[in-house]
Amino acid sequence: IVLLAQVGVKVVLVHGGGPEISQMLSRLGIPSKFVDGLRCTDAESIEVVQMVLAGKTNKDLVSLIGVCGGKAIGLCGIDGRMIQAEKIADKPELGYVGEITKIDTAPILNALADGYIPVIATVGVDDGGMAFNINADTAASEIASALKAENMIALTDIRGLMNDVNDEDSLIPVVKVEEVDALIAGGKVSGGMIPKVRSCEKAVRDGVKKAFMIDGRIPHSILIEMFSDEGIGTMFVK
């Protein structure tokens, strides 16, 4: 990320913090529950989400970028009402999980213009000032589309989409967006992978040229995917 920024690529880092949130909720004795890969978030949990995402994970990432020689600034979707959201009407069981209604790109563009790497914690806000937990993959897609980004890269803990999750050699290197529904219906995409795949699909449908799903655990995976002929993950195209 730092190298890309140093060679002139405008990089925006959008992050969640699912494991960290689950760990903190567990320490506080609050159970974690998920529906279709989305965390059910009650009034108590949304405070923990804000605390962990904006107060801990975000600052850890900003600090790490600084250690690597980059210049980053931490932002939360509430800042400048950057990520405007409302409650998901047809899924009341999710509680304070929001769907995005608008992205205000001004804070992001201002940070980029000043030479910073914006690091964005995905908490949204409604007209009444209520905070909402926003799925990070969904937020990344909406932000990429609003910025008219050329590429969006989703970092995961698997190689990409697989024909057989138990076979490392069954990677699907390229997926056309019209194939996504069939992949989900066929069970090749399930659980927490559904929001990731849908976010890549939506980004491409909304004008992002390419979306990538790659294994973030592989050293330099972003550079390999973007600057090699074969890549190492799954690329989504129209």
Which residues does each predicted region cover?
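Nucleotide/pyrophosphate-binding catalytic subdomain
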Residues: I1-R217, I224-M226, E230, V237-K238
